[in-house]
Amino acid sequence: MKTGIVLEGGAVRTIFSTGVCDALLTRDLLPDYVIGVSAGIAYGVSYVSKQSRRNLDIMVNYINDKRYMGFGNLLRRDNRAYFGLDFVFGTIPNELIPFDYDTFAAYPGEVEAVVTNMDTGKAEYFPVERRDDRFKLLQATCALPFLFPVFDIQGKPCMDGGAADAIPYERALERGCERVIVVLTRERSYVRRPEKLQPLIDAAYPDESVNLRIQVPCR
């Protein structure tokens, strides 16, 4: 029976999901398919690389570090994002709290991330490259409007996947999963409301406003 796991995003709330994944690792349980959105998959790759507590270590050591996140990063012309992209997706995994690329590459299953195509407003699903030491796709799936630039993924303008498909369980079923574990970062009763900032989104992204009738998830 093919088993998949779906990891919802949610910025720092996603540390809950990493606890679930770490618990699965204690039983040496890895599914055949992993898909996530935004911070869900950004943290989820450490589950696939079998690095228990890695995400917790990052959170404890760097969550209050201005290099990690802060408006100062957004004002830098070489960054243009609330998160310090080079620090988060380069320095941390390659120097400070090393990511195990070899174990990640050896995983025999599928790993996908969700992004929102800014031309269509629809979700796109891409495999996470096993040897990308810049994690470009993970940067794109975390790219909230206003707080990140638009990322080019295979010639398509992409941003945060949670805008188009926040809980991609249907994608897991499409990929042949017969059993799907869904890890949420909101309470069971949570219902996402219409986005109050939609007029600002339309103004900020005028070229996409016809197609991009989306609800940006509240973080």
Please tell me what each predicted stretch does.
Residues M1-V37, V45-R219:
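Patatin-like phospholipase
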